[in-house]
Amino acid sequence: MEQNKIISNVKFADIQVIKEIPAAEEKKVSGKEYITYGKDNKYPEYLWNLYLRSAILQSIVNGCTDYSMGNQIIKDEAIQEFSEMVNKDGEELDDLIKKIFVDKYIFGGCAIQRIVDSKNNLLELYWLDFKNCRVNADETKVFYSKEWGKYGSTAVEYDMYNPSTGKGDVLYFKGHSTRSLYPIPLYVGGITAVETSTEIARFHLNAITNNFNVNTVINFNNGVPDDTVQDDMEKKVAGKFNGTDAQTFMLSFNNDKDHATEVIKLQDDNFDKKYEALYSSTLKEIFISMRATPALFGLNPENTGFSKQEFLEAFELFNRTVIQPNQKDIERIFKQLFGKPVIKFVPFNLEVKE
């Protein structure tokens, strides 16, 4: 009987959390002219937050942007003066293009607002934050709001780009991979890996901060409280150490042992090494999804060395398969806006010291 009593006062809690990756689903909502994008119409915001949370994704996106800007952007003489200040915010054309590249690498698309006069002469160009853009089913309208998902949120409505209308509009670019209304980011196949890398970082942070991140037994040796108190204590411990902040723990409520609370760590099962191996494979998966080599972004996770020739060959391949296609997209976009080719990227000059 006593044995059964002891067992009844031992509580196990597996506090591992399965993280749900948002789906990039498109949906027509009754009463709304635009098509929603993801749960609560906030999938682009999820991608943006993923970029902010992941040092690896930031490094890749920012590096791709720098590579894509090249050594210089040559402008046609016809737009030289305009390029020095493309809007009332005082932005230069290069500023606008850099923002566009960032959006292309995070979201897979971009949007540019065009301001014209009554004779359809171009007056200003503005970058529109792509995470705030939605479109209607026939792609004739662009809707812009900073508060998608909030009750009662409103959106500014723009016409989709049409050079013959003689009024301002928005050039909406959704890339080449999508078969629907919204773009697909290049790294879509690596999103789970990016999430995993952020959880690994959190695990190590909490390992250092809390020194409490492996399977643990917690003995409360100052009496056995009733079930309500036990449940409350379990919730408090789970709230303190959850997700990647801890693993499975066990609470034991005992009548004595000098009224002390004792913490016993079980064998850690080489968890640090498992995380290290997981991080290595995760990193590889992220870079594969971006068709990139870690060394091009200052990383060489396996410490295998990387010769100058290998580096140059890797950059040449990456430049041909990722950077140049994105540069050509931007050149075509501005050809649309001005009616003729007006910009040309001078390739990034990669200098590698022996």
Spell out what each predicted region is:
Residues 1-255:
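Structured, contiguous alpha/beta core segments that scaffold functional sites
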Residues 176-333, 342-351:
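A contiguous, surface-oriented mixed alpha/beta subdomain in the mid-to-C-terminal portion of proteins
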